[in-house]
Amino acid sequence: MLKMESTQQMVSSIINTSFEAAVVAATSTLELMGIQYDYNEVFTRVKSKFDYVMDDSGVKNNLLGKAITIAQALNGKFGSAIRNRNWMTDSKTVAKLDEDVSKLRMTLSSKGIDQKMRVLNACFSVKRIPGKSSSIIKCTRLMKDKIEGGEVEVDDSYVDEKMEIDTIDWKSRYDQLEKRFEALKQRVNEKYNTWVQKAKKVNENMYSLQNVISQQQNQISDLQQYCNKLEADLQGKFSSLVSSVEWYLRSMELPDDVKNDIEQQLNSIDAINPINAIDDIESLIRNLIQDYDRTFLMLKGLLKQCNYEYAYE
């Protein structure tokens, strides 16, 4: 004979396997989403939620009860199976309906709608009376069946107990929210003041940089004016130099072709650009030195032909 504990152990094994599958599904989903996680924390959270949903929804007890019914049927005790004939049709329909009911129960439990709330909503409904603030509480067919089946008890002590909504201290909650709001407001003001100080500092640095740039521009302008004046003075000096040399050249007893050659070189001096003028003067001086050297060589050769000697004093 099949022991009753064996079927219950099989159901417990299936439930545990479902929990492990839920943990694997949760961790693999987090990995696919690129979210870092602590396996122990995920395991603990999933286990807590899984145990609560399975217990509160009644799915665990329902499965264990069916395991007991199957074990009794296999052992020749058909009483439980006969009692459940009202909802039995065939195995496929029962499995599908059972799956849907379990899914709905677990969904409601995961949304915070616990077993107490589901039972009360299934047993009672409220009918509003038009024109009145009061209402009529109606019992459903399920409540009637429970009363007839002796599943309803009267708890006189429950009347004296305060409802959860009456124990809520709204003033303390308001004070907490007000403190949180004030703290948030203070943090926002601190960040705003910090931003204002940074903005002021940036403006001060910008104004300081503008002053430095303005001073540098003034210095550059003064230097440009000095350079322009210096260039004008050099142009005047070069023009005066050319005129003075030309006047001095005309007073010399040199041949006209020599004077003309020197005047052409003087007139070729660029009096506008000082750099070019210096190059032209350098070229003129080189030519004069070269002419002087040639003249000296000619004079030296002439003295030698005349059997004269020369000496520098």
From Swiss-Prot:
Single GO MF descriptor: RNA binding
Positions of the UniProt region annotated as Interaction with host EIF4G1: 208-313
Coiled-coil parts of chain: 166-237
Region (Dimerization): 150-206
GO CC entries: host cell cytoplasm
GO biological process, one term: regulation of translation
Compartments, record wording: Host cytoplasm
Keyword set, alphabetical order: Coiled coil, Host cytoplasm, Host-virus interaction, RNA-binding, Translation regulation
InterPro entries: NSP3_N_rotavirus, NSP3_sf, Rotavirus_NSP3
Superkingdom of source: Viruses
Region (RNA-binding): 1-149
Region described as Interaction with host ZC3H7B: 170-234
Subunit structure, interactors included: Homodimer. Interacts (via the coiled-coil region) with host ZC3H7B (via LD motif). Interacts with host EIF4G1.
Membership in a protein family: Belongs to the rotavirus NSP3 family.
Function, as annotated: Plays an important role in stimulating the translation of viral mRNAs. These mRNAs are capped but not polyadenylated, instead terminating in a conserved sequence 'GACC' at the 3' that is recognized by NSP3, which competes with host PABPC1 for EIF4G1 binding. The interaction between NSP3 and host EIF4G1 stabilizes the EIF4E-EIF4G1 interaction, thereby facilitating the initiation of capped mRNA translation.
Designated name of the protein: Non-structural protein 3
Organism: Rotavirus A (strain RVA/Human/United States/Wa/1974/G1P1A[8]) (RV-A)
